[in-house]
Amino acid sequence: MTIGVVGRKCGMTRIFTEEGVSIPVTVIEIEPNRVTQFKTEETDGYRAVQVTVGERRASRVTAAQAGHFAKANVAAGRTVMEFRLEEGDYQAGDQINAEIFAAGQLVDVTGQSKGKGFQGTIKRWNFRGQDNTHGNSVSHRVPGSIGQCQTPGRVFKGKKMSGHMGAERVTVQSLEVVRVDAERNLLLVKGAVPGATGGNLVVRPAAKARG
């Protein structure tokens, strides 16, 4: 796993190329990622860098978290993330920002999808509806059979049924970085990314190379 950064989704807009082509982009604010801990194979069994972003009131931080942040001499953040490292060294207090990316680079963006609440199978799993007429009574949006009879006598795990939709960890792969604004700590990524405006996003170099 290659090092990435934690950002905040600002929303979507579009930019134009010199030829006048409109490109839809998502604006991601890459707040300074403050290093809270650098893990090594000698001390932790693997190499990784732990970062925090944003701010959090002291009353909302547990004693253990407060001690961890104080040991690193960094302000308490709203979240803590960890990135595996193959090479490179960091120290507690270092900052990582949008400058680790370049225009044209492919990235993977991870976030929490928008919650949709309890939904039926048509909206949740794209099931087709049943007949509107021809003897159908109050079964227009029901899923139908969910299994067999005495054998196996149960509903298999993973059966697509009604339930809570959204609010899941989602990763969109191989999105192109259109522009990097280092002065304003902004990253413009082509296309849409998961989650609502203001949500946390994790941006990493793409795991799968095209071509």
Curated annotation (Swiss-Prot):
One of its GO terms (cellular component) is cytosolic large ribosomal subunit. GO terms for biological process: translation. The modification N5-methylglutamine is found at Q150. GO terms for molecular function: rRNA binding; structural constituent of ribosome. Pfam families: Ribosomal_L3. Part of the 50S ribosomal subunit. Forms a cluster with proteins L14 and L19. Belongs to the universal ribosomal protein uL3 family. One of the primary rRNA binding proteins, it binds directly near the 3'-end of the 23S rRNA, where it nucleates assembly of the 50S subunit. This is Large ribosomal subunit protein uL3.
